[in-house]
């Protein structure tokens, strides 16, 4: 609705909550209607419109590139990242798809997390440099370098309260 302008988005959200305006009118709250937002709302189901934009069902079997997903337990959008992981393995059991997941929010997973989230004091072990790990990942796939050390197995998760990482 507001592009990358986070402050504008916050202001629009608060105004929407305060006024009770219908959700499909939220893009007009600040006088700047958004044709993309309206187009998306006109497709509330996972119909052909959305299916053309993302892998769907058997499409996952054709994904034959290494994939690294970094996600967080507190990420309100994590269901999409984990959906792609599950579907990739479902249709391509030999996929080279790795997951790093820990106590991170939506943005925290890509910004090294934070020492506290929703009142929970995050374990020191969980505060990893995800940007550096991403660079290491690219070196691994493009330059034949070693795989990032944290990727012990395909699924790598931080055990909250135990100050440790585990892998499956």
Can you annotate each of these PLM segments?
Residues 35-39, 43-52, 62-65, 71-78, ...:
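Alpha/beta-hydrolase-fold serine-hydrolase catalytic core, especially in secreted/extracellular enzymes
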Residues 1-61:
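Accessory cap/linker subdomain of secreted extracellular hydrolases
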């Amino acid at each position: 609705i507001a592009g990358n302008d986070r402050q504008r988005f916050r202001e629009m959200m608060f105004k929407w909550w305060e006024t009770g305006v219908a959700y499909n009118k939220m893009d007009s709250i600040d006088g700047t209607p958004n044709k993309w937002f309206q187009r998306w709302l006109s497709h509330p189901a996972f119909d052909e419109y959305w299916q053309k934009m993302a892998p769907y069902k058997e499409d996952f079997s054709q994904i034959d590139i290494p994939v690294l997903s970094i996600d967080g337990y507190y990420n309100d959008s994590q269901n999409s990242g984990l959906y792609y992981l599950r579907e990739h393995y479902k249709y391509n059991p030999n996929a080279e798809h790795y997951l790093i997941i820990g106590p991170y929010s939506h943005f925290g997973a890509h910004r090294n997390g934070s020492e506290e989230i929703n009142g929970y004091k995050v374990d020191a072990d969980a505060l990893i440099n995800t940007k550096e790990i991403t660079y290491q990942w690219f070196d691994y796939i493009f330059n034949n370098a070693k795989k990032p050390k944290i990727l012990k197995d395909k699924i790598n998760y931080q055990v909250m309260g135990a100050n440790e990482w585990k892998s499956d």
